[in-house]
Amino acid sequence: MQRNLVVLLLLGMVALSSCGLREKHFQKLVKYAVPESTLRTILQTAVHKLGKTQFGCPAYQGYCDDHCQDIKKEEGFCHGMKCKCGIPMGF
């Protein structure tokens, strides 16, 4: 049952993240949806790690630029799986 809940929550988070919701929204969802336990701690850690990794970066060309314009009003660059604001790639 808990495994099904975890999978359902993660799929829901992936679906909602495509709508532009940020990590803090998912943390709040986990806080209210999952009772306080080891499972909640694991889910919060997973949400934080996934929130730090921007999977859209290599797949969607303008993701980093949109992300950095939203946060810092700078040009964004994709560095592997993570966006860097105002730091161009140095090859």
UniProtKB/Swiss-Prot annotation:
Disulfide bonds: C57-C78, C64-C83, C68-C85
Main location (coarse class): secreted
Signal peptide: 1-20
Domain BetaSPN-type CS-alpha/beta, chain residue ranges per copy: 54-91
Gene Ontology CC terms, in alphabetical order: extracellular region
Pfam families: Scorpion_toxin_alpha-beta
Lineage top rank: taxon: Eukaryota
Positions annotated as propeptide: 21-27
GO molecular function, one term: toxin activity
Record InterPro entries: Long_scorpion_toxin_alpha/beta
Compartments where found: Secreted
Organs and tissues of expression: Expressed by the venom gland.
Keyword terms, alphabetized: Disulfide bond, Ion channel impairing toxin, Neurotoxin, Potassium channel impairing toxin, Secreted, Signal, Toxin
Protein's job: Inhibits voltage-gated potassium channel.
Membership in a protein family: Belongs to the long chain scorpion toxin family. Class 1 subfamily.
Protein name listed in UniProt: Potassium channel toxin BuTXK-beta
